C-alpha cells in the first residue's frame, strides 16, 4: 500500500484496493484498506475546484437537437463520441498564461480518442482534435456530441461532421450534465494532476497533460469498466 501511494499519491483507498486486487492478487475489503490507510497516514493528494458550464455561442449558425439525450453508454467503440474544451493556466514570473485542451471521449470504453493543445480557444483547436480522431479511426461514423460552445455551432464544423458520416448532437442550454462523462474526465485529470500544483512553463504543463492522457488510457483502472483500463476494454470489444 505504501508503494502504491508513493507511486501515485493521488489514489484514495478505493483505487488502492483496486490496485491490490488487480495487480497484486490480494483481494481486500475496502473498509480494511481504509483503516490501514488511516493508520499509515496515507491520504489522497487530490484537490478540488469549482466547476462551471461553457457559455453558449451568442450567434450560432447551426444548433442540432440533443440526440444523445444522456444515453451515456455504447455497445461498441466509435459508436458515440463526446467532445469538449477545458482551460489550464501556467505562470512565467508574475505573468499568467492560458492553455486550452480539446479532447474526444468514446462512450463505450471511455478512452480518449484524440486531443489537441493550443494557446487559444478557437475553431482550429476543435478541428485539429476531430482531424486526429478521423485519422486514427477512418471508418468511424459515431454520434458526435458537444455542448453549445461557439466552435461547435458553426456551419463549417457541422459540414465537416456530415462529410465524415457523423450525426451531430448538442447539449441543451446550461445543462452541463448533458455532456457529463467528458466533464467528468476534466475533473479527474485536474484533481489528480493539476489542482494544488503551480506550472511554470508551457512545456511543463503540456508534458503533464500528454503523460496523464496516456496513463488514463493505458494504466488507470476504472470500476465502471470492471476494474480495467479504457484500452483494455477497447481491445476486448474489438476482439469480440
Residue ranges, per PLM feature:
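RNase H-like two-metal-ion nuclease catalytic core shared by retroviral integrases
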Residues: 54-59, 146-148, 154-157, 168-190, ...
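Basic, flexible linker segments flanking DNA-binding modules
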Residues: 1-76, 175, 229-238
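Short small-residue beta-strand/loop micro-motif enriched in glycine and branched aliphatics
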Residues: 109-115, 168-171, 195-196
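An active-site-proximal beta-strand-loop segment
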Residues: 70-113
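Mobile genetic element proteins and their domesticated derivatives, centered on retroelements
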Residues: 1, 16, 33, 37, ...
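Hydrophobic (often cysteine-bearing) scaffold residues that line and stabilize catalytic clefts
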Residues: 9-13, 29, 60, 64, ...
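Active-site beta-loop-alpha junctions of metal-dependent nucleic acid enzymes
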Residues: 97, 115-137
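C-terminal domain-tail junction helix/linker
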Residues: 162-166, 188-240
